[in-house]
Regions:
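Short glycine-/polar-rich loops that comprise or flank the Walker A/P-loop
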Residues: 40, 71-72, 95-99
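Active-site proximal helix-loop segment of RNase H-like, two-metal nucleases, encompassing DDE(D)
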Residues: 43, 113-135, 146-148
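Short, aromatic/basic amphipathic alpha-helical patches
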Residues: 85-95
Length: 178
């Protein structure tokens, strides 16, 4: 969200954290579509006005244009409705090198790109002041450029057995609800 505070916050001083007003003026939103190459850490990102199947297909086309021919592209997705829309599935049928994998409900942490989103939020967006969507998108694009200048491969720090156990606990919890 492009947010502007109604008043400037007080700066940090020795022994006191900086402050920020609770109220703000909202100047609009943007959607960041991002694809993380886990092997080298590079991120392909596109800011778009909305998050519908049309924008998602445009982003898939950007991935298609940026990944060398002949490589299989594994796309990890949440269960957002736009990802399963018939036109998206038709696009997928026409692009057999793309393979979609959907994370279980409430398991977005299994998607490595979520780590990138968290880092972007912490380092660039949190406590930021953006007086327009254009300012917000410029900040996101600068961060993408910086991150891609010296990318780092994504490495899981949790042991695979812990990850699988967490997924199984989540599945059991969901199945017990029904």
């Amino acid at each position: 969200m492009a947010l502007d505070r109604t008043q400037p916050g007080l700066p940090m001083k020795k022994g006191r954290a900086g402050t920020m007003t609770h109220d703000y003026k909202r100047h609009g939103t943007t959607t960041l579509f991002a694809a993380l190459n886990v092997l080298d850490g590079s991120v392909l990102g596109r800011c778009m006005q909305r998050h519908r199947h049309q924008e998602f297909i445009r982003f898939l086309n950007a991935i298609e244009a940026n990944v060398p021919a002949g490589k299989i592209v594994h796309v990890i997705l949440d269960n957002y409705a736009a990802h399963k829309q018939p036109k998206v599935l038709a696009w997928l049928a026409r692009h057999p090198r793309f393979v979609f994998h959907f994370t279980p409900t409430s398991c977005s942490w299994l998607n490595a790109v979520e780590t990138f989103f968290a880092t972007l939020t912490k380092r660039r967006l949190k406590r930021g002041v953006f007086r327009s969507v254009v300012d917000l998108q410029a900040a996101i694009n600068r961060y993408l450029d910086e991150a891609n200048h010296d990318p780092k491969p994504f490495l899981w720090t949790a042991h695979p057995d812990k990850i699988i156990a967490a997924v199984n606990r989540g599945r059991q919890a969901l199945e017990s609800i029904h």
